[in-house]
Amino acid sequence: SNITDIDDKIIEAANESNIPISELTKKYTDIYNADMSYLNVLPPDIQPKATEYVEDMINFIDKLIQKDKAYEKDGHVFFHVPSHEGYGKLSNREIDQQLAGSRVQVSDIKKNQQDFVLWKPSSKSQPGWDSPWGIGRPGWHTECCVMSEVNLKIPFDIHGGGQDLLFPHHENEIAQSCASVNSDLSLIHI
């Protein structure tokens, strides 16, 4: 299991609670691990945190840009969804049947409204890392994909996650993995 310890919702929740992001993520990581222990689930051999892999994420994103699977615009880097022929296969969603603006705000800087963010600029009040595209932070889908790619042999056997993550999260992980290593992220998705 990996730990997302930086994303927009975490930044917002930490600001609303007036506590450091690290304190908030530690609290929920501890709760998660306690719940898993209560259920008699063995602890993972490794439990990577997204912030420990930002350099890997920057290299991963740069690789996707070099392969013409992603593009930069105004400090944002987007994955170009039409570049992945199998997009929508896991969730049984046709690209041309998706309604622009139904899930995320319509953006005039995207080539295609289904394109998703790999890197986004950070304001002075938000955490950020130096990158070829400016100070910013990785997108959530990229965090999970890169931590998996660094720590596991791709494709790994089983990828699990909540039904609520099927689209767009798992679909976007698959698209990035296929673009990066020409392989699905895992053999089985549950």
Please place each PLM-identified region on the residue numbering.
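N-terminal, positively charged nucleic-acid-binding surface of large information/translation enzymes
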Residues: 1-40
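Alpha-helical recognition segments enriched in aromatics with Gly/Pro capping
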Residues: 34, 55-189
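Short secondary-structure transition/capping motifs
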Residues: 17, 21-25, 46-53, 166
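Short, glycine/charge-rich beta-strand/loop segments that flank catalytic centers
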Residues: 3-7, 29-32, 42-57, 75-84
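Short glycine-enriched loop/turn motifs at secondary-structure junctions
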Residues: 41-42, 159
